Amino acid sequence: LTSGGSEIKARLVEFIEDAGLADSNIEEASVLVAGGRGVGSADGFDKLRELARLLGGNIAASRGAVEEGWISKDYQVGATGKTVTPKIYFACGISGAVPHVVGMKDSEIIIAVNTDPAAPIFDIAHYGIVGDLHKVIPELIEIIKETGK
């Protein structure tokens, strides 16, 4: 797996059978794949939905993505949204502003993907990937599909 010319070493630890996407009850999800303004558009959430589906989780969003009109407020995490505590929280294109972080900081594992190495989300992430989510997420999806068969 490579991103931006750098190699990313990945290993599938566990494959969770495709459980489909749940409704907007993100508080109950064990895996959340969240997108922020860095997703770039409503269509940008398509790959996040696919990753969430493969992991048996759900999607979520930052206030910025909701304000852009890319996703319903039902999926918003943070001070003006919902508080979540999943086992795994993917923060994709989310800067890590305090109002968002207060709603997800107690997640067991936080994985951040952002092009800005100084993004505050990396301060709380257990794992971080500095790279373009539009390259990293599709590569991760392919790894899961290849190793999950």
Each language-model region and where it sits:
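N-terminal glycine-rich FAD/FM-binding segment characteristic of electron-transfer flavoproteins
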Residues: 1-149
